[in-house]
């Protein structure tokens, strides 16, 4: 009959527990730390990755997005930074919510392409090269190069007679 309480092997004689390959990939992947740091903190992303300081109301806006609030209204005048804050949020979401499909629209085509989407493109150019190089910027779409169908920002207009239907 076997001993129910066998003497354990000395530590030097015990077999090491094999590591999974995925453990090594995670341990050696700086993007894992990047996600931990910025996934729930768009304000820190804007400050450290985009190297700019948002206004207090933009901080509140970004924090509402991070909290998962789906309906956010910003009442303000012209030129105060609504498109800028929206661009920051889209870029943050693109990098930290993979896979993600961000579809953006505006009341008119000129507002969409000349203001909002132009602002997104402007901030993509500000990204550090290690991030900017991961993106392909097109006229109406910004894609993650290696996942162009899984992660993108797309500008879409709608018809005046049916504004709820994006084209």
Describe the residue ranges of each PLM region:
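Phosphate/NTP-binding elements of NTP-utilizing enzymes
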Residues: 2-167
